[in-house]
């Protein structure tokens, strides 16, 4: 049975529809950075997706090739994730002006993936997929203390969920803790190409700290 992060780490991938506080452990990702409206056909975001999945599936399918990865176990490729920000000191996201988005689009990798394994996967995927994988990176993220919530509905309706998260943490004595490395985080549990907008499920996560 392939290891499924969504099922084994439910506190990270299946939070309640009401806000909750969680301490997120360090993780590794295959990631691509970019800018612009994620809905733009042929834009940086759309072009990043085949690169991410190309690396993730190359690692997963290494069991059938010549590469022997130490500590390997079969796994279900985790859901697509994204870290988003705009040039705003507060860390607030303006969903109207999507052209101003900066993003790190990413997919979680198992902890057994080393730098050497990652570099091998990049070279292997580039050979097989005939794509330019120079934009991908092995990203280490340590989110730590966060508030999160399951958002159901269109992405543009996320501000209501974010407001509920902020109200919840304020009542408990926490404040937002955005920085260059602590960002608005989304985990996409639904495929927008196959799911009605009102049924989309997205984990929304924000960094927090104790109020001084």
Describe each region flagged by the PLM.
Residues 1-212:
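A solvent-exposed interaction/effector surface
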């Amino acid at each position: 049975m392939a290891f499924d992060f969504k099922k084994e780490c439910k506190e990270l991938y299946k939070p309640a529809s009401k806000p909750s506080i969680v301490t997120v452990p360090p993780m590794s990702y295959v990631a691509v950075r970019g800018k612009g409206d994620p809905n733009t056909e042929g834009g940086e975001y759309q072009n990043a997706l085949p690169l991410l999945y190309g690396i993730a599936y190359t690692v997963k399918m290494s069991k059938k090739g010549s590469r022997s990865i130490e500590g390997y176990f079969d796994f279900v490729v985790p859901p697509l994730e994204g870290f988003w920000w705009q040039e705003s000191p507060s860390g607030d996201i303006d969903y109207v002006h999507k052209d101003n988005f900066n993003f790190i689009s990413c997919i979680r990798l198992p902890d057994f993936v080393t730098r050497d394994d990652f570099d091998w996967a990049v070279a292997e995927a580039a050979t097989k997929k005939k794509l330019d994988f120079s934009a991908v990176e092995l990203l280490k993220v340590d989110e730590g203390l966060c508030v999160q919530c399951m958002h159901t509905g269109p992405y543009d309706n996320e501000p209501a969920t974010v407001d509920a998260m902020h109200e919840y943490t304020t009542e408990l004595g926490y404040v937002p803790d955005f920085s260059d490395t602590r960002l608005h985080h989304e985990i996409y549990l639904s495929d927008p190409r196959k799911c009605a907008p009102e049924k989309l499920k997205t984990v929304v996560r924000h960094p927090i700290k104790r109020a001084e």
